[in-house]
Every structure is written in C-alpha cells, then in structure tokens.
Amino acid sequence: MDLSVIKAASLDLESLPSQPTVSSFQQLRETFIQSKSEDWYLKNGLFFRYYSFLKSSLENATLDGPSQVACLDTISVWLRRIFNACKQDPEISKYVWDTMELKFWTNLFSLPANKISIPGLTGVQVAVKDVFSKSLQLYLLVCPSEDIKNDFLLDSLKHALHWDRHAKVVCTAIQLLVKVTGAEAVFAFQPDFFEQSLKLLKDYSYAQAISSTILTVLTLRFKSLSEETEDREEVETKWMNIWCPIILYEFYGNDRQVQAGMSSFLIPSLLGVSPGITVKFLSRLQNYPNVSKDARDAACLYALKIAKDSKIIKNLDLVKEHAFVKTLFKHPDIKIQLACFRLIALCPNVSSPLSFEDFDCLESNIEFSFNVLDPDSRQILLKSMQDFFIRLRASCHSIARTMRSRHSDKVALSGLLDRAMQFLTSFISVCKKHLYPTCNYQQVLVSLSFLDTLISFGLDDNVESSSIREAQHDFPFSMVIIDRDLSRLMIDRLKDPYDDIRNLCLKILLSYKSLPGFISDSDAYFLFNHGLELLNAVRSHECDGGAKTIYLCNHFMEKSVPGSVLANTKVILNRLKSNIEHAKTSLLEAAVNCPLQGYLIQLTYIFQSLSPTIVKNDNESWKNIVMELIKASETIWGLIKDVLCDDSPEGNLPDGEGEGGIVSNLEDTPAQLILSYSWRSLKETSSLLTVLLTKCLSLFDEEFTPFTLNYYGELMMTWLWEIRHRGAFTSVYPCFIEYCSFLFECNKHEISELPDPWLHKNLSVIQEKSSFITRRSGGIPLSITAILVAGKDKREQLIEQTVISLISIAKQPVEQKNIAGQFDLPQVHAMNTLKTIFTEHRLSSVSVEYLEPAIALSIEGFSHELWPIRNCSVMLFTALINRAFGSKKPKDAVNLGNNKGLSTKMFFSKFPTLHDYLLRELEVSVASLSSNDQPSTGLYPILNMFSRLQYAQPYGNENEWTGLSQFEPLIFKCTASRICKVREIASLSLTCLLDCSKMTTFIVSQLKGVAGLQQNEIHGKLLTIRAVLSCFFSKLTLQQVQEFYEVVPLAFINCFLEFTSSKTSFYAKKLFLEVLNSYFMSNTDSNAKRLQQLRRMTMDYCKRMLLDRKANVTNVFNTIGLPIHQQMAATIFLENLKEFSVYCDAHSIGFLVSKLLHYEFYEVQLTTLRSIVDSPRKKIIVNNPEILQALIKLTPRNQWSQVRALALSLLSDSLNSTSYRLLGISCSDMVSNILSNECLPIKESFIVLLGSCIKQLKTENFLEYKVTFAKWVEILLSYSNEYQPFSSRKAALDSIIHFDLFNAESTAEAFSFEFYILYLLLGDFLNDDDEEIRSLAANHAYQVLGTSAQCVTEIWNLWKLRTKATFGGQHDFQHCINKRLILEDGCELASVQLDNALSRNCSLFERERQNLYYSDNQKLEDLLFYASYPNEKLKDWATDGINAILSRFEDVSRDGPLGKTSDPNVWFTIYKIIRIAEHVHLPLDRVHSLMNRIDGHPSFCQ
C-alpha cells in the first residue's frame, strides 16, 4: 500500500467515518507509526488533532469486537508517541495535562475492568495491558502535582483491588499500580488482601498471575520493613507474620486446588525472598498446632519438595535435619510415599550426585513401589523412576568426568560410583523377585516396566542400539541387566493371563541382540517346541503365549540360521491343516484337543513382521504357503458357519456333537466349547486373512488380482452380514476396516475403486427380505461403517450418499404384510446403521453435518406404529444426542450449568433447520396434549434435547438472543400437563431459557398466584423451581446468594399454607419439602430472619405431619404419595432435630426418634435408621433407652428385610449387659439365623451383631461363651475368604471389631481357646483385596497395637510380631498354622497336591484368585514366620512332597522355560514343599540336583 496515500487519508479528520471500522483504525495507527517526531511537538499536532476522535472511540459502546481491539492498538501507539514527545519537551507535557480530561484518564485506567474479554477474539488482554502500562507511564510523566498524582493513583488502586482478578490483565494492572503507590496502600484499602487472594488460587489457570500479584505486594512490603530496621531476623519474622499463618492454614486444609496453586507458584517465590525464610517456614510447619505428626511430616515433605524444586535447598540431610523423611515411606497414604521417593531421588540439577544416605534410604524402602495399586499413582511412579535413572546416569557421568581432574578426591568419587552400581544390582534383584509365579499383577507390571526403562539407558552391552534412548552422555560403566534367570522368568511370563504383561515381556526380550542365557541352537529349538505345545492350548492367553514364544525364536533363529522362519512356518502350517481335518470329523473334539486359534495367531505374527528380504530367498515356497492359508480361511469358514450363523449361536449344538465319550469328561458344556472354538477361530482367521491380503500384494502381485481382492472383500462382508454372534462379527469389523483402508490407499486405480461398489451392495443387502432385524441388525451396520471409516480421502462423499440413502430407506412406508411382526424390516436396518455411523468416533467430524435430518427421522420414529421401529428410533436418538452434545449424562441429570456446554444459540446456528422443525413438532405435540391429554411420543425427545442445552449468554454489547421466544410458552404449557413425566422433562427444558442472574426474580414470579391453581400446575411450578435451582444455584455470586436469601424465603413463606394445605397432593408437598431441604434448611445464618422463619415453619410442619395423626387425611384416595412425603418430612426432621429441639415441646429426642422407628411406613423407618447410621454420634444415639427399645422391636422376622438388617447392625453398637437381655435373641438363635436361608443382608447384620453379643456373653455365661465362640469363629472363617463378596467380608471384619480385640486381649480366658484365630483373621483382612477393608482392619490393628497410623504393610509387619509373640507357643495355634500351610483345596498330602497341579486342566477358564493384592508366596512366607521348629507335622508333609518331586520329575529330560515347573500351580506347590522343608531343616540336595539336571525353575536350582 502507498504510504503517502495512507497519510493523506488518515491526516484528514473529515475522512474518518462517524462509526470507525477496523480499517480506519489500522490506517490511523500506521499514520502514527510513520509520522515524524516534530508532528507531535506542535500544539495543533497529531496529539491534539486526534484526541477527541480517540476519546469518543474509546467510549463508543457500539463498536464491534475487532474494531474495539484495533482502537486499543491505535491508542497504544498514540500514547507511546505522546510519551516520547513529552520527555523531549516539558511544554508538551503541560499541554497534554491541560488537554486530557480526568474522565479520559479514568477510562484508560478502568480498561482492565471493562475490557477483560470480547467474544470470539483473542489478544484482547494483551492490548488492554499495553494501553494501561503506557497510560500509567504518561500519567506519571505529565502530572504536575505529587498530591494529585498520589490521590489519583491511590484511588485507581482502590478500585483495582475490587476488580475480578480472574483475568491476567487485572493482576498486571494491580502490580503496576502497587509499584508506584507502595504495598502499605494495599493493606490499608483491603486488610484481608492476602486471604482473598489465596482463595483465588483455586483456579489453577490464573494461579500464576495471582501469585505474581501477591508476591509483588509482599516483596515491596519486605523492602519497606528492611528500610525500617537492619535486623534481618526481625524483618523476616515480621514479614512472615503477614502471610505465614494463612499459608499454613491452607496448607493443612482440605482445598487441594488452592494448595496446588500455592505450591506451584506462590510458596517457591516466597521462600526465595530471603535465605532464612525456608528454615523458619519448615519450623512453623512442624510446630503447627492441632494436627497429627503424620500430617505435619507430610506438610514438611511437601514444603521440602517445593524448596528443592526451586533450588532453595540443594541436598537433603537424611541423617539429622531431614531424618523424618525416611519415616514417611511408612505413611498410610501411598501418595506421600511416592512424594518421599521423588524428593530423594529427583533433583532439578540432574547431574547432582546422590549421597550414600540417599542410596541407603532408597534401597531399604524401594519395596513400596511394588505395592502401588492406583493406576494414576503407578504412572507417576514409572515416570519418576525414569527421571531417577536419568539423574543417576547424569550424576555418574559427572562423577567420572570429575575423577579425571587432577585435584579430585578419586577415592570418594569412586566409592560413589561403586555405590551406584550396587544400588542398581540390588534394584534388579528386587525386580527379579517380583516376577516369580503367583506374584500379583501390579508387582509384575511395575517390575517389568522398571526393567524396560532401565535397559533403554544403555547399561547392558547386549541391548540393540535401536532400543537405547538418545542421550548426550552414557553411564561410565556397564552391567548385565537381563541374565539367564531373568530371561527365563520373562519367557515364562509370555503366557501370562494379562495382555500388557505378555507384550512387555516380548518387547524387553526383543530389545537384545541375542536372547540372554539362551544362545545355542538347541535352546532355540527347545523353546520352539514348547511354543508349539502351547499353540494347541484351549485358553486364549496360553495360545498367544505360544505364538509369542515362536515369534521370539524366529527373531533370533533367523539371525543364526537363515531360513529358519520358513521352516518353522511350514511346521505350523502342517499342524494347522491337521487340526482342520480333525474339525471336519468333529467340531467338539477339535475344540477340546485340536483348536485352531493358536496357529492362526502365530501365522499372523509371522506375516506381520515378514520382511521382503526373507521372502526373496525362497519366493516360491512363501507364495505356496500364502495361497494355502488363504484357501484354509475359506475352509475354516465352512466348518464354523453353521454355528455362528445360527439365530441362537450361544446354545446351538450341531447334530451328533453331543454324543460320545468325550462329552462325559468335559468341564464346560459342549455348546460353549464349540461356540468359543468357532468365534475365536473366525477372529484369528479374519486377522490372518487381512494381513495376508495387505502384506502380500506387493510380494506376489501376480496372485492378488483385483478379482481376487474383490472376492475376499466380499467374503469378509458375508461374515458381517450372516454371523449372529456379536463377539465374532465385532472381531471382523477392525479387520475389514484395515483391509478397506489398504485398498483405498493403493496406487492402482482398479484396486482403490473396489470398496465403492461394496458400499452400494451393502445398501442393497439392507433392503433384502432375508436379513433379520434381531440383534440390532447384527454386523450389517458395521459392514457399511467400516467402508466409511476406511475411505479417508473419500469420506465426505461416501457419507453423504450413504446417509441420504439410509434416511430414504428408513422413511419408506412399511408394507402392510410386515405389520404382523415380520423380522425383515429394511427401515430398522437403516436406523441401526445410522446409529453405528453416528456412534463411530472416527466419523464424528463428518457425520455431524447430517445430524439434522437424522434427528428429524428419529423423532418421527418415536410415533411409529411398529415397536421395532420405535425401539431403534430411541437408540438412534440417543446416539445422535451424544454426538451433538458430547459425553453421556447420567439418568435424570439436570442441566447443571456447565459453562462449556452447547448453548441454544450455538446449537441452532450449527443446526438451523432444526429450529423450525422442532417448533412445528412441539406445537403439534402441545396441541395434542391440550386437546386429549395424550402427548405425541415425539414430545419426549424434543424436550430431552432442550434439557441438554445451555442458556445463550450475551457478551459485551450483544443483545439477548430471542430465538427461543416461540418455544417458551409451549414448554411452559408442558409444565402444567396432566402427565407427570411431561411435567418433569419440561421443567428441565426451561433451564435453557433462563439467565442465571435472573434466577431469583424468576422463582419469585413462579411462586406468585399459587392460590387457585390446579394440582398439576402446582407440581409443575415446583418441578421448575427445583430444576432452576439445581442448574443455577451453584453459579450464583456471593452478592446474588445474599439477595436470594433475602427475597426468596419470604416468597415461600407467603405461599407456605397453599403448598401444605390438605387440598395439595402429597407428591407436590414432597417436592416442596425437597426444595426447602436442599436449599434452605442447611443455611443457619442467624442474621437472615426470613430464612430462619421459613426453617421454623418447615420444621413445625414436618413434626406435625409425622407425630400428629390428625394432620394426616384418612381418605385412601387422598393418601397417594403419602409415604414418600412422610419420608422427606422425616429426613428434614431428623437432620435438624438437634438444632430445633427447643421447639419439640416436652418430648425428648429419644422419644421422637423412637416414634419414627415405630412409624407405619417402612420408608420413614428406613430414613430414620439411615440417619442414625450416618450420624457421627451413632453410638450415643443407639444407647438411648427409648431408641434401643424401638430398634429391638424392628428385629423380628415379620419386619421388612431392609429395615431389619439396618436395625440389627445398629444394635451391635449398643450392646451392654442391659441391652443384651432386652434383645431377647440368644447367640444360638443368631447362629441359626446366619446358617439359615435368610437373605444375605440379614445374615451379615447378624454376623456383626454376634460379635457384640459374644463380647457381652463372656461376662455373663462363660460356658455358653465358649460354645458360641467356636461357632462364631467357624462363621467368620466361612465369610472371610477371598471368594466371598465384599459385604460379607466386611461384615466378618466388623464383627471382630465389635468384639474388640483391644479389650479382650487382656483377659486371661481369652488365651484358653481359639482366640488366636481372630488375630489370624484380622491379619487376613490386613491383606484383603479391597482397600477399604484393609484400611478398616489397619485402624483397629494400630489401636490394639497402640501405635500411630502407618501404611498397611508396616501395620501388618507389627501385627505379625504381636501375633507370634502372643500365641506362638500355643499348641493349638501351631496346629492352625500347620493346617493353613499344608491344606490346599481340601487336600492335605503334598504328593496329591503336586499331582493335581501337574494334571492339565482343559477348561476354557481357570479359577482365578480374587485377591490380587496378596500373593500365594507372600502368604506362605508369612505363615512360615509363625510356624514353630521342630514341627513333625510339617516335616512329614515336606518329606512326602520331596519324594513326590523326585518321582514325578525323574524321567523328565529337560523342563526349561514354559515347562511344568514354570506353571504357576506347579511352581507354587514345589516352592511350598521346598520352603517348608527348609523351615524344618530337611536336606534338599537331591531336589536341587534334579532341578539343575532338568533345567527347572531358577528358584529351585542351586
């Protein structure tokens, strides 16, 4: 653009429009930039000529958003040029001061409050910040009077402190002003500045800006204090008194968001202001009153981390000053343990070396990392360990470099390097220990993840360079990470039940140049044969393990013996063909003895990784194999087709398969075996076929013509069309997507065009009469969706023609002959396909364009005469709503005011045609509703959509959007409908029509004129009020909340009598009470007089309705809804009973509660019981005589089970000698109830109660106590094992807790019989699979132990010591331990247990352990800790076991990896025999010699 033209146009004021635009502002800004300096010195220069224009533009409220930003940018340049001119010429300064009015200065300084954001624009705050800073610079320069300057700036600061600081520009403005006015002014204007600012840290996105503002003020205050006195200690103390008490309060509080904001930004900066601050802060943390030692230590740990991350503290002193850190590894919270590890192991300076104390602490506590159960914490742990290895490598490299220096202390530095190597060696051995069979999932996963990370650091020379992460430096030493034993453990884990463990093991082993420990060809072939055996397994994870083993062998064998992959593939192919032949004879026999899935998985692995180099070496052989496999896929399909295509494949048994001797020996049903065999075979066949077709086209292009590719594509579609088993056709779906993607991306035109006609063929299939609509159209929708997903470049075109065709099919009228209940409706197939298309996330960006016609289609389908079409319309509508509005919402969820939701304006701008359509449909539905009280079924989806929308909030100068003005009266009519469901959903729909700021006015208007309304109208108004409050109440500002409680309670008081009159239905009354309870009864502000009056009126009403029988109507018709009304009244009455007890006349609280427990409606009884259960004063309440009597009366069999169960469990908290006699149920009766066929909650309540009763029985009837105690222990044993449900195990634990081991332990008779079992059971609960049960058990255990709260692992160690010290010498205790040690599934002999473990189980599923927290070998070691020596019982058992091992493995030539001794069941049996033999000092030389000879598991060899 010609600059002279710009100047000429812009300098002419007449050329500037009255309503400036972006272009005019840009021209003017360019003029200011290009102008000469002398143009600004003249009194009639650029400053004066454009002052009025810019002043009016700044005040112009009609400018659009972009023009406002352009105006600010222009003013910024204008201010900068004036500032430069004023610096050069004082006369100009005076002229500027005289010219610029106070109002203009005020507008400039108010910009951060008035221009925080402009909808649809970015960079607004940057522009405002620029203008504000330049305005402040200019004002400080031109203002002639210090008094005027100070007054104006102080006034500006006063206003700025009340601005919304959830904007960075506001924070910047305050900082700029404070630097001029001083920090004292801040505290003078806002004494609670620091407290208010801390609350703002809750929003993490603004925490940095707010922290910077706080720091600016406090730093200035520190400087002013330093000027007052030279005593640094006094200055630091005074300064810390300003902020430290509030920081400490929040530090120990519960607001995690504020704590996160403080820790990340504020505290590090505060601690860095002065060197002595950190020490003082830690001292104040440790001496903070009224918190536990654990909490103080955890807070100090947090502060140390902040200081270390900020480099305020470089090294920890774990011996003296920071010794408490080591104890925090035993903290109950795993997050604290993890933070402790990170504090020691990590450092901002990665080359900073660890001390000997650091290594010792980490090494002694590293076990904690293998017990991290929470997935999120485990991810943090793995990332922390990776960072630790980075630091370790960098520090070792730094040490080695320093050692080369002439003046370095080589001995000390060499010692540090040796200690690092020792630590890594110890760490690897710990990881190895947690890979043994029976170790739990998280231990194995963490161990493998650690090893996978460690090998990527280049420590092991045998690791491939491609597996080593890039780094600037390496470890100065090398070491073997994966040795033969670890390699063996990982190979054994290749058949682990968990996919991620199998994959991780394979990844680690493939990272090596040669398989560690297995370098000979014989080793490879031995592994290969073991893999072949696993391929024939029935269970899928074992098949996959065999396939991964052979894949591993192929990887290393091909390096040493080229052609091994081809030879191995031929072997697998021959076995596959043999198994196919068996299937032709009998599917059942094939499913049991000759499955296909393992071989198919292995072949898929082979061809996925097959390189062209290997193929070129023997092209013809590979081609023959490929063609045989492709033909085999068709043969397999022919064998299993009848099973998978049956209308009921789950129960289908082909003719003749149920006969023969094989059936009698099966652990699974024949139908289940055949079905599993069939669908898994098809799953792997489809994967293999896809790999062959996509991989081999480039290798054997002459064999894979377009005709061939088309044929097998149609074969896959046939699978999707005809298969009725969901698991089978859903497994084909991803394979078909992959195949179609391959074809679409092919460079050959004739191949890339193949999927197009398939799409038309699929649409034709939809209209065929042979396709049944059951099972949601089966795989037909997936067949179409797969093509759409695959066609990336053609996706828009394909979806357009597909969706239009499907909608057209769905709208076709149903033929009259199909109305009688036929199952071949193309309309249903079309809708189900549309649902699948809109559900597929990979099509979301394209499919959303067709939501409008699809929504209209689904709404119309709601009213269809055929149920199948109505049904799939509902499913389609749900899919469309989720696509339009995002994630699913829970049932009956109210529009909770999510600011990120879709507003009405945005929704109808995205889908404009829906506006008129929905309005037309809603008018028809409401008219139908008004005329005959029969709603059109389309009414529900329309109202449902509106309930998902948000109010269209206007921004800036925008007017309120009125696009829903025609909908509003229609929806309001629905709120008064005679149909309750319509009223409910309509009330939710109204929330999108209401501005949050107008909520109070709206509610008051709804409450006016209630008198004379019909019941449906009253109920609708209350539903509307509830919905509005649920949506908006949490979004109100403090001022709006105050206004709400000033105005709304009076409105409720005025219509209280109408809502509670006898004419009002109990449904409406219940809703009225629900609203009052949710939003008014919990507010105890004594200054709100009207609110308190409303609360008293509500309480009086609830009391009258509950306790005054005359207040309840006797007409049966008028009592509809009375039970739920009374339930809500009871809820309010009980929650506020203590506060309003003065209004309860002369009746005691116990009398009132007992009255409710005797109430005629069980709903009221349940509410009362649950209120007592949830009360922190539960024990005091239950022991009230009147309440106790009432609870006892609720225990007979004629009571409702829910009521009875709660009453029984509450009685366990009340039992003393008096209440036990009042109960009227003997302990033997309780035992009988537990052993009877009572429902489980009743049994569990009796179990809890029995623990309390036995505690009382001990003091009254010791003989009965002994008999009952034994029965109680038997019950606890049966209800506490890991296969019982959570509630039963918790009931058993609660029973022990109510028995109270702490008090019972001191009695002499406690040790005369099976008291020790309770200790063992509590130990079991300390190792339960559920964290809640472990925590409850730990709480009771540390009370008995008399220790502070620690982590469960540490509590368990202390509990073992106490149990052994107390009972270890008792014969019965040792007998019990022996029984626990040697008994397995009811079998006692070791030889029989070993035989059972060695016998192969061919069932589809193994019995899995439910306790994944406590492994078998951990349990064994703990029991051996209790076991005595000498012990003849264990000695005999171990002798039998040793003999069994020697005899069973005598003829084995080699066991090796994946062998019998690696099987978890076999391994544990042998391990248990060996460990018990070691415990009783039996010689094991022959066992070790045998295991060495047969290459048994490493843990058995010496």
From Swiss-Prot:
Q: Does the keyword Nucleus apply?
A: yes
Q: Which GO terms describe its molecular function?
A: enzyme regulator activity
Taxonomically, the superkingdom here is Eukaryota
Its localization reads:
Cytoplasm; Nucleus
Gene Ontology process terms (BP): tRNA methylation; tRNA nucleoside ribose methylation
State what the entry records as the consequence of deleting this gene.
Loss of methylation of the 2'-O-ribose of cytidine at position 32 of tRNA(Phe). Increases occurrence of 1-methylguanosine residue at position 37 in the tRNA anticodon loop of tRNA(Phe) and decreases occurrence of wybutosine at this position.
Q: Which terms are listed as keywords in the entry?
A: Cytoplasm, Nucleus, tRNA processing
Provide one Gene Ontology cellular component: nucleus
Question: Any keyword Cytoplasm?
Answer: yes
Cystine pairs annotated here are none
- UniProt family annotation: Belongs to the THADA family.
PANTHER family reported for this sequence: DUF2428 DOMAIN-CONTAINING PROTEIN, THADA/DEATH RECEPTOR INTERACTING PROTEIN
Q: What does this protein do?
A: Together with methyltransferase trm7, methylates the 2'-O-ribose of nucleotides at position 32 of the anticodon loop of substrate tRNAs.
User: What is the name listed in the Swiss-Prot or TrEMBL entry for this protein?
Assistant: tRNA (32-2'-O)-methyltransferase regulator trm732
